[in-house]
């Protein structure tokens, strides 16, 4: 497709933080004006004194996920409905829908932000999109970004019976997939499925250039393991259904916030204070969103933000995503987080072949199960238990399991029979699948 560039800000159009802040404030007045058109913000804002600077904006209450749920479906809508291009809902587990919607103009911004990959996306690429489509944004977003630059998109989904892991591996191998988009865990499962199919991930997929990943916190240790398994760079992306892409990785491996397209704050929920950098929860104000403007939207993701220099020259703040505060669990007096525990698991020697694991935090003990070949089981159990003790000062029970225990072999190799709905069956056919086709 290779559409001409839009008039939105592009990388390299500013020099340093001051230029960046000036760019943000130049757009902020328009952003607030758009927001004032929605029923939610019309009630929250003082029409006679709309915020015009970042300092003014900081006086407004945070917008929360609950605000979005309470205003389902269109209480946040700031344009006529006929201007909407798509409607989405996030994948949260709160039980209430969290809506998001975008105009065609919003989609230009969305696709451009996602496509800011240092390795590039071009018409020569075959791009496997292996995240959900349906009501979620993620699959549609990657698809749009790929087409924006002319890539051939393979819409793999990852919540479809029509695309089991065996088919993912076949498509990657036979089509010569060059780029993929998925959660990091998928890349590990593909490697296992490829091995089960008789392939060597690092050598039998020569067209593969990079793995784009996002959707879960990713430690350096797991990233390095995935990269070694496949022999290509792992390039991280960070965002949400409510906002689209918020950060991407530069050639030097650092994750940068797209602060030319959004205004970011770091919120300390203990004190209620906000600042431009440091550790806390990420608060975002997208600057170029018409359909559903968000002012000071709290993503509730724990992050660390800094404005230190980076050799890439993008002059954008860097971010480390630490996950959700609610994802930590107590064992004794220690708080165990998946991020810290993952770093320990993937710091085990590659020779142990530990990539699949799970853990349960109990009152006095951390129970961990890992898939590991029998010849490495005792060493892996002992080393991981020692690492947990050193990192958290808690007792742990590490159990090595045979391959196929946590990720069953049939999940890697099965090809489900996906059929259209039928009502009439022959005498020897299974009519249990009538109407409910699966």
What residue spans do the PLM features occupy?
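A polyampholytic, Gly/Pro-enriched intrinsically disordered region
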Residues: 173-182, 229-233, 254-263, 420-426
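General small-molecule cofactor/ligand-binding pocket signal
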Residues: 154-157, 161, 235-237, 397-407
């Amino acid at each position: 497709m290779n559409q001409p560039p839009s008039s939105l800000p592009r990388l390299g159009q500013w020099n340093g933080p001051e230029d960046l802040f000036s760019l943000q404030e130049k757009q902020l007045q328009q952003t607030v004006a758009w927001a004032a058109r929605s029923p939610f913000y019309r009630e929250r804002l003082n029409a006679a004194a709309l915020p015009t600077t970042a300092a003014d904006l900081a006086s407004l209450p945070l917008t929360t996920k609950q605000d979005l749920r309470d205003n389902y479906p269109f209480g946040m809508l700031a344009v006529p409905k006929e201007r909407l291009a798509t409607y989405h809902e996030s994948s949260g587990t709160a039980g209430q829908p969290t809506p998001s919607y975008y105009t065609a103009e919003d989609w230009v911004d969305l696709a451009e932000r996602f496509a800011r990959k240092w390795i590039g996306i071009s018409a020569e690429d075959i791009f496997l999109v292996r995240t959900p489509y349906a009501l979620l944004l993620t699959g549609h977003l990657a698809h749009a970004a790929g087409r924006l630059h002319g890539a051939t998109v393979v819409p793999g989904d990852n919540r479809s019976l029509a695309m089991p892991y065996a088919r993912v591996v076949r498509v990657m191998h036979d089509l010569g997939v060059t780029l993929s988009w998925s959660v990091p865990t998928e890349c590990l499962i593909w490697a296992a499925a490829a091995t089960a199919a008789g392939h060597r991930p690092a050598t039998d997929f020569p067209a593969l250039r990079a793995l784009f990943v996002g959707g879960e916190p990713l430690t350096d240790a797991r990233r390095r393991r995935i990269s070694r398994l496949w022999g290509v760079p792992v390039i991280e992306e960070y965002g949400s259904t409510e906002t689209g892409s918020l950060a991407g990785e530069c050639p030097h491996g650092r994750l940068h916030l797209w602060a030319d397209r959004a205004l970011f704050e770091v919120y300390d929920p203990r004190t209620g204070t906000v600042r431009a950098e440091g550790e806390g929860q990420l608060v975002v104000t997208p600057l170029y969103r018409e359909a559903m403007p968000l002012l000071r939207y709290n993503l509730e993701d724990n992050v660390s933000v800094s404005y230190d220099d980076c050799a890439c020259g993008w002059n954008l703040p860097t971010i480390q995503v630490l996950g959700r505060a609610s994802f930590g669990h107590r064992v004794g007096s220690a708080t165990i987080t998946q991020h810290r525990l993952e770093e320990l698991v993937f710091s085990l020697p590659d020779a142990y072949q530990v990539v699949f694991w799970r853990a349960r935090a109990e009152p006095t003990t951390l129970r961990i199960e890992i898939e590991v070949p029998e010849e490495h089981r005792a060493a892996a159990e002992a080393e991981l238990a020692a690492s947990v003790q050193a990192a958290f000062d808690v007792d742990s029970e590490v159990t090595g399991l045979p391959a196929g225990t946590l990720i069953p072999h049939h999940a890697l190799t099965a090809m489900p029979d996906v059929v259209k709905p039928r009502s009439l069956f022959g005498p020897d056919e299974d009519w249990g699948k009538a109407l409910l086709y699966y």
